[in-house]
């Protein structure tokens, strides 16, 4: 079974995107990372930083997660991210996404030993 840490990497890590600037980026990535297998995942964020930099966030500013848990952390610096949001004309299995690039601080939930990101909570 895929570990929570490996699932985070599959769903959210893209350190050196070849085509993040393309409007088709989300359509391609959501499909290739299996985020449209049994439904169209409505919203997903990809982070274009090294895995080490994202894992380091687990030791940065401790914040409360959206669900009320206390194991979320906010990055000290803004990171290059791409937000993928399902567009109105999207219908499974033909999932269609809008691609939006941004520079924002990320908030991730961390757990385990080693202590690593397992959930992308928000960007601010």
Swiss-Prot record:
It is an enzyme of class 4 (lyase). PROSITE patterns: RNASE_PANCREATIC. The keyword Phosphoprotein does not apply. The lineage of its organism: Eukaryota, Metazoa, Chordata, Craniata, Vertebrata. Monomer. Interacts with and forms tight 1:1 complexes with RNH1. Dimerization of two such complexes may occur. Interaction with RNH1 inhibits this protein. One of its GO terms (molecular function) is ribonuclease A activity. Pancreas. The keyword Disulfide bond applies. GO terms for biological process: defense response to Gram-positive bacterium. The active site is at 12 (proton acceptor), 119 (proton donor). Signal peptide: none annotated. Residues 1-13 have a biased composition (Basic and acidic residues). This is Ribonuclease pancreatic. Disulfide bonds join 26-84, 40-95, 58-110, 65-72. It catalyses: an [RNA] containing cytidine + H2O = an [RNA]-3'-cytidine-3'-phosphate + a 5'-hydroxy-ribonucleotide-3'-[RNA]; an [RNA] containing uridine + H2O = an [RNA]-3'-uridine-3'-phosphate + a 5'-hydroxy-ribonucleotide-3'-[RNA]. Keywords: Disulfide bond, Endonuclease, Glycoprotein, Hydrolase, Lyase, Nuclease, Secreted. GO terms for cellular component: extracellular region. Endonuclease that catalyzes the cleavage of RNA on the 3' side of pyrimidine nucleotides. Acts on single-stranded and double-stranded RNA. InterPro entries: RNaseA, RNaseA-like_dom_sf, RNaseA_AS, RNaseA_domain. Residues 1-25 are annotated as: Disordered. Glycans are attached at residue 34. Substrate binds at residues 7, 10, 41-45, 66, 85.
């Amino acid at each position: 079974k895929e570990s929570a840490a490996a699932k985070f990497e599959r769903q959210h890590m893209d350190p050196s995107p070849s085509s993040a600037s393309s409007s088709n980026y989300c359509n391609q990535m959501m499909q290739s990372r299996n985020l449209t297998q049994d439904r169209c995942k409505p919203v997903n964020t990809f982070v274009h930083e090294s895995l080490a930099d994202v894992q380091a966030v687990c030791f940065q500013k401790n914040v409360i997660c959206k669900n009320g848990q206390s194991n979320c952390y906010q990055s000290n610096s803004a990171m290059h991210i791409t937000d993928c949001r399902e567009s109105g004309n999207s219908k499974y299995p033909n999932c269609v996404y809008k691609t939006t690039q941004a520079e924002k601080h990320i908030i991730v939930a961390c757990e385990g030993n080693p202590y690593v990101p397992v959930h992308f909570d928000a960007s601010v």
